[in-house]
Regions:
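HotDog/MaoC-like acyl-thioester-processing domains
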Residues: 1-7, 88, 93-149
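Hot-dog-fold acyl-thioester-processing enzymes
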Residues: 1-86
Length: 149
């Protein structure tokens, strides 16, 4: 059964704050095989003009996944999480994320469409610091596979 189009525009406000730490950044950089000194060495980051180590551009996937899960688990939407796959992801950064950031995320369902028996959800998230300043906007396409015939 197709997802309800009336969910287009639904917003999911922040429910917690994500604390960005040096170790989290280092682990993520190591996981993606990026040895950039700006991700590992506080002195190198400061010399480049940053307050602390910065995160790789895709680091925000870590907190964005929690937002996607919040939508997927919304009982009113009725999405079958076991049938969902991540289609694509894009980031529009206002500034680099750095150790010491406290981030909050507001998620919105931008579009829902059905095609070839599958549902496609376009989800955006605004990631802000605790002062409300925009840090990054993300966009994800989620695909909910239809039932096999």
């Amino acid at each position: 059964m197709p997802l309800d189009q009336s969910f287009i525009g639904r917003t999911y406000p922040p429910t917690s704050t994500y604390s960005v730490g040096r170790e989290k950044i280092r682990e993520f950089a190591d996981a993606i095989g990026d040895g950039n000194a700006l991700y590992h060495d506080p002195e190198a980051a400061r010399a480049a003009g940053y307050p602390d180590v910065i995160a790789p551009p895709t680091f925000l996937t870590v907190i964005n996944l929690a937002a996607i899960n919040k939508i997927a688990e919304d009982p009113e939407l009725g999405m079958d999480y076991s049938r969902m796959v991540h289609g694509d992801q894009s980031f529009q950064h206002v500034r680099p994320v750095h150790a010491g950031d406290e981030l909050r995320l507001t998620t919105r369902i931008e579009d829902i469409m059905a095609r070839a028996g599958n549902d496609f959800l376009t989800v955006t998230a605004e990631i802000t610091d605790t002062d409300g300043a925009l840090v990054c906007t993300t966009r994800a396409q989620l695909v909910v596979r239809g039932e096999a015939a």
